Amino acid sequence: MRSWFLLCGRLSNIGVFYPTGNGIDWGIHLARMGVSVSAVSVVGKDEYGDKMREALAAEGFDISHLRVEDGDTSVMLMALKDGVDRVHLEAIDGVMETYRPNEDDRAFILEHDIIHTDLFGNCLDLLPEWHDAGKTVVMDFSVFSQDPEYACENHFPYVDYAFMSFEDDTPELRDWVRHAQELGPRVAVATLGEKGSIAYDGERFYECGIVPAEKVVNTVGAGDSYIAGFTKGVIDGLDIPACMKAGAELSSRVIGSFEPY
């Protein structure tokens, strides 16, 4: 497995911080389900960087390619609102701003079967390399799949499982999901928050509702956990509906806990 962009989340109004980031949350879930996971990225020479390396090593990650460089670890400052909702205040890029995988990192990546990335890991130009090498690429486009700034249509052809985030299941959304899948992915998935998710595989659409949670403590990690559950289903050879259900079940468990995994 492979995870890329990582940062520490710090809840500034209650003095709590924890390792997070799309790929990190995803990787921690998979590691806890018995999947071998590696992190290829960078942290700074600071307390956050030390804690990140310690935490990921404790989760069983291979951190041999988690570099340590002069500067600050990437941090997302958040606040806790009404005891539940996390509000993003500021993103501090730190050493991630200039990070690039070196040749050794790139060779290490290609030793793995599944690669997870997003739009912010400074590695979009490597997507064709991974695709040509026959790797399974899982990519989180979040809410930006239709944003012209990110030119996601240029990336879809090199992705196997494309995940996007929207609010409502509309005919226009289905047209977009179908269009995205036709550009290359085996499956394109749109998560819809409390309205569940839809997926398209080139032949038909699939729908999956949510799994009700006993309580809602944190919705920040819902998307990453859904992708992790879906990915584990792919690894286990499950069909698309079962993968979607696995994602929904894991997401339901996560929103009932304080941390995003």
Model-predicted segments: where are they?
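Conserved phosphate-binding/catalytic region of the ribokinase-like
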Residues: R174-Y261
